[in-house]
Amino acid sequence: MLLSSSSHIKNLQTDYDVIIIGSGAGGLSAAVPLAQAGLKVLVCEQHEVPGGWTHSFALQGYRFSPGVHYIGDLHEGGFLRNVYEGLGVSDDLEFCELNPDGYDHILIGQDRFDFPKGKANLVSRLQKHFPHEAQGIAAYMDTVSSMMENLDSMRRIKSIGGALNTISKGAGLVRWTWRSGKDLIDRFVSDPLLRGILSGQSGDHGLPPSMVSSFVHAGITYHYFNGGYYPRGGGGAIPNAFVRAFKKAGGKLRLKTAVAHILLNRNKAVGVELADGSKLTTKYIISNADPEVTFGQLIGRNNLSKKLRRRLDRLQYSVSALSLFFAVDMDLRAAGFDSGNYWLYDHADIDKIYRLGLTDYILKNKIPSALFLTVTTLKDPGKMRKGHHTCEAFTFVGYNAFRKWAHEKSGERSADYQSLKDKIAENMLKALNKRFPGIRDSVVFKNLGTPLTNEHYIKATRGSLYGIAKTRRQVGPGAFPIRSEIEGLYLCGASTLSHGVAGATFTGLLAAKSILQCRISDMLKTGGRSLVIHPAEDLSYWQKKGK
């Protein structure tokens, strides 16, 4: 596919038309349509595998995916599904649908609530559990829908009349611009347990509900209204499918290729210098790295405006995590597990729990007060190894808790660092065993990642999970724009308009759209097969497939 609008790019002589720094969901979703439009595109990835947070890795034969646990918006007609099919990546990408009766299980103390697929089903179940809050539950969910649908309408505005119509519909939503997720919940319901349940997915943005933007909170709830999905083959299946489409269109990917500097001519980005000292020229650069890496390291503060320097100095990055990757010799389905995710909380004050997660409390030999657990071999039943289940558990921690070891080389850190990791892993397993007796004694393999692991492999500032923190002042008008103040330099990824696989993918499309000077729909015409969705919970289905 060659867009006529790409002709304006081809009259300058450079090594590449576009160089993309980083192969995360944002970088690759920009790379594919640009290459399909006939541009000469290079993606530089510092890691040995593509994907950024969407990559997978193997340890002792067990496959893990640190950043992809479930994805929404893959129902028929969903935007992300349309992207995968429109770019042709659906030819090499399949998903498994998580338990439609509970893609997220929220466990608070001794109480449990399962989030079912479908907004109406969710409202009905919540009202059944909390009949005294029935009216507030309905109003809350309707407000969540209105907030997201009006945001989507604003993106589609094509006329003054359309703008006025959207503004009139969304006038009542302006009140939420500077409000938090907690404000949104508390406006409609008062039951402490219900408030905790509605805050139960806060790990998808990593902030206390009182700190996160109401629109980010609402967006996560809305994103999963039509269920949760997991890529067959693990998170790495997503970048692998994008890379195949990218190379098919003539794009070039260089792994283990770190960019050391973005080259400027006055205030225009003209190329990159790689870590080996070689230089490449280009007409455009798209950075999938976070703002500190892009501006602070690759460009340098001295080359930035005072306004941008001040902004970098004030930035808050999202929380980091302790990531426990482990395998168990235990029949987890017989023990009551299914393909849904498990959010474990000691009590219903979710705000207090997430505030603790911003600190170093867990280093003081504490049992985590919150955990996220997922069993990837129940999400994707085709990936069992030796009859063992692979599991991933996460709890939040502030980066400063591990700062003292940051100067030590990865893989060669001191004995006290490894000893601390072992202690934390044991405490996480103790916490899981309290909820699920027997799981701790069934562990046959375990490995713990820390914020320093994230910093090394993902190049994430402060080991952040979601780029910049999605506070009220750092989203919307406060987010980093796709087009930077440096001419020819574009941004994508979690620190721009949105995070997560779907959010980052959207930002990559916006970057490509800006360069091609077209509409997003113009870039989604390659046409792949209809996305294949497998039912994770249908055991007879997997038996027939011989898996």
Give residue ranges: language-model regions.
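N-terminal glycine-rich phosphate/pyrophosphate-binding loop and immediately adjacent elements
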Residues: 6-146, 468-470
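Rossmann-like flavin
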Residues: 109-212
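A glycine-rich dinucleotide-binding beta-alpha-beta segment and adjacent secondary-structure elements
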Residues: 191-208, 368-374, 429-498
